[in-house]
Regions:
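Charge-rich, low-complexity N-terminal segments
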Residues: 1-42
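Hydrophobic residues embedded in beta-strands of well-ordered beta-sheets
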Residues: 26-30, 52-54, 94-96
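Short, surface-exposed beta-strand-loop junctions and turns on beta-sheet-rich folds
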Residues: 37, 62, 104-105
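Short, conserved beta-strand/beta-arch hydrophobic-aromatic motifs that form part
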Residues: 41-67
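Short, internal acidic amphipathic alpha-helical interface segments
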Residues: 57-99
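Well-ordered alpha/beta subsegment
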Residues: 90-117, 121, 132-139
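Helix-rich interaction surfaces within compact, conserved domain-sized segments
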Residues: 124-125
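Short, highly charged C-terminal tails/helix-capping segments
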Residues: 131-176
Length: 176
């Protein structure tokens, strides 16, 4: 059984990517695993039967339950300085989540692909920033001003790596 948004996944991720129907039949989903600077994470792509929306949920299950106050500080800062994704921490399993929803009803697959996957790459960078900032905060105990300075330097370095690695065959600069 295929979903009408399967071509979007195929073009944006890999040819074998396709949505699977949930057990209760209300939603369709696909899980993409990706590697980034701070480790391995996943993204759940969810939609409904009609393909009226596409929700992306990034998750990292390795955050753990130690240093929760520092993590919540970083999450609050990042939720406050950008509005592209919302971050959540699940106390029950020690996982970090980031969500963003796109209304895609009435759009052509190519439009959806361009809209979603450009933002997906940016979401992964922002997600990596939160994990990096959390690690930095735990290691240094620094204040907010020092955190912003360190994060700006981290992002400059990321941009340099992406620019340097563009054009290397088989290399995706989003994972630099």
């Amino acid at each position: 059984m295929t979903h009408k948004l399967d071509p979007v996944l195929d073009a944006g991720l890999r040819p074998e990517a396709s949505f699977m129907k949930s057990q209760n039949g209300e939603k369709w989903g696909y899980i993409d695993s990706f590697k980034h600077e701070q480790g391995q994470s996943k993204c759940v792509f969810e939609t409904d039967e009609d393909g009226s929306f596409l929700q992306l949920t990034l998750m990292n299950e390795d955050v753990g339950e130690e240093n929760v106050p520092e993590l919540l500080e970083v999450i609050n800062i990042m939720n406050g300085i950008q509005d592209q994704v919302r971050f959540f921490y699940h106390l029950g399993n020690g996982s970090l989540f980031a969500k963003r929803e796109f209304l895609v009803e009435g759009r052509k697959p190519k439009q959806i692909q361009e809209m979603v996957f450009e933002r997906y790459d940016r979401m992964k960078d922002i997600f990596d920033d939160v994990l990096w900032a959390f690690d930095w905060k735990v290691r240094t105990g620094g204040d907010f001003e020092a955190l912003f300075e360190a994060l700006a330097k981290h992002n400059e370095d990321r941009k340099k790596r992406k620019d340097r690695n563009k054009g290397k065959e088989g290399f995706d600069p989003a994972y630099a």
